[in-house]
Amino acid sequence: MSVLRPLDKLPGLNTATILLVGTEDALLQQLADSMLKEDCASELKVHLAKSLPLPSSVNRPRIDLIVFVVNLHSKYSLQNTEESLRHVDASFFLGKVCFLATGAGRESHCSIHRHTVVKLAHTYQSPLLYCDLEVEGFRATMAQRLVRVLQICAGHVPGVSALNLLSLLRSSEGPSLEDL
């Protein structure tokens, strides 16, 4: 078990692999199932993990995109994400990591303020997406978006790289933290 690096493994031919990290097993599995239903030109592989580090395995494929799923109803979810981030190499944050906050629709039940997750994403210079994964329609839409982002991060979209995508996502964000 060690730091997860983007170039530890060779890429698979026409394969795109996403790692979903989060404490909500059922929601992660539902999101993974929705992603696998999506139309994808490449072979899509979805791996789930409660936390990092991953056990070192010779058979584990190269990870093209890591999505940290933070449930805003659980402080443990945020703590788990913060601890897992320590096991990710800095070069992964060049467009191959994003945060997904779920549960924002019922703010009265949230134990984590949205601003906390915004600061976390800003600290790691990574995009932050919001989606209520408990709603099937929202989950299906998020699955589509994640599959598209994964294809870009895996290098399967000509003319667009993970860094290009990162700069596009950052420029479409709202005001910076300093402006708030």
UniProtKB/Swiss-Prot annotation:
It comes from the Eukaryota. It is found in: Nucleus; Cytoplasm; Chromosome, Centromere, Kinetochore. Isoform 3 is highly expressed in spleen, and intermediately in heart, prostate and ovary. Isoform 3 is highly expressed in resting CD19 B-cells and B-lineage chronic lymphocytic leukemia (B-CLL) cells and weakly expressed in activated B-cells. Isoform 1 is selectively expressed in activated CD19 cells and weakly in resting CD19 B-cells. GO terms for cellular component: cytosol; inner kinetochore; nucleoplasm; nucleus. Pfam families: CENP-M (PF11111). GO terms for biological process: chromosome segregation. Transmembrane segments: none annotated. Keywords: Centromere, Chromosome, Cytoplasm, Kinetochore, Nucleus. Component of the CENPA-NAC complex, at least composed of CENPA, CENPC, CENPH, CENPM, CENPN, CENPT and CENPU. The CENPA-NAC complex interacts with the CENPA-CAD complex, composed of CENPI, CENPK, CENPL, CENPO, CENPP, CENPQ, CENPR and CENPS. Component of the CENPA-NAC (nucleosome-associated) complex, a complex that plays a central role in assembly of kinetochore proteins, mitotic progression and chromosome segregation. The CENPA-NAC complex recruits the CENPA-CAD (nucleosome distal) complex and may be involved in incorporation of newly synthesized CENPA into centromeres. This is Centromere protein M. It comes from Homo sapiens (Human).
